[in-house]
């Protein structure tokens, strides 16, 4: 089973080293399955304005997408979108809840 989420530090769009294997696994899957397409969905915690979080979510999605491109995934298999703070996974406001929401999710076509 592939883990679907890459988590980020507060106000960051840099993929942390511990999540590079997750990105590499998805890149490998996509290269072996050229008919599949992936949407990388950038998300943020609830802190900050809607506009800022949409931009941050987009940077997170683009960061994962760029890493996949470097790993050899063709552009036409990837789409980066931002949901900002619209798709919170954890609805509380603790540090742990906020950390759970700072992520990029990989979703495949047909899912």
Roles of regions detected by a PLM:
Residues 1-2:
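Short, small-residue-biased leader/transition segments that mark boundaries at the very start
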Residues 9-15:
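Second-shell loop/turn segments in exported
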Residues 19, 53-61, 99:
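Short, conserved glycine- and acidic-residue-centered signature motifs
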Residues 31-33, 97-100:
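Extracellular/periplasmic catalytic domains that process cell-envelope and extracellular macromolecules
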Residues 34-43, 58-89, 102-111:
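A non-catalytic structural micro-motif
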Residues 72, 95-98:
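Short, exposed beta-strand-loop hairpins at the edges of beta-sheets
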Residues 90-94:
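Short beta-alpha junctions and helix-cap segments that line functional grooves
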């Amino acid at each position: 089973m592939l883990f679907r989420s890459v988590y980020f530090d507060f106000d960051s769009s840099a993929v942390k080293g511990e999540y590079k294997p997750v990105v590499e696994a998805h890149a490998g899957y996509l290269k072996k399955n050229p008919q599949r397409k992936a949407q990388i969905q950038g998300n943020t915690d609830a802190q900050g304005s809607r506009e800022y979080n949409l931009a941050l979510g987009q940077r997170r999605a683009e960061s994962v997408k760029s890493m996949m491109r470097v790993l050899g995934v063709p552009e036409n298999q990837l789409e980066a979108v931002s949901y900002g703070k619209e798709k919170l996974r954890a609805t509380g406001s603790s540090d742990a809840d906020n950390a759970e929401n700072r992520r990029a999710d990989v979703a495949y076509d047909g899912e």
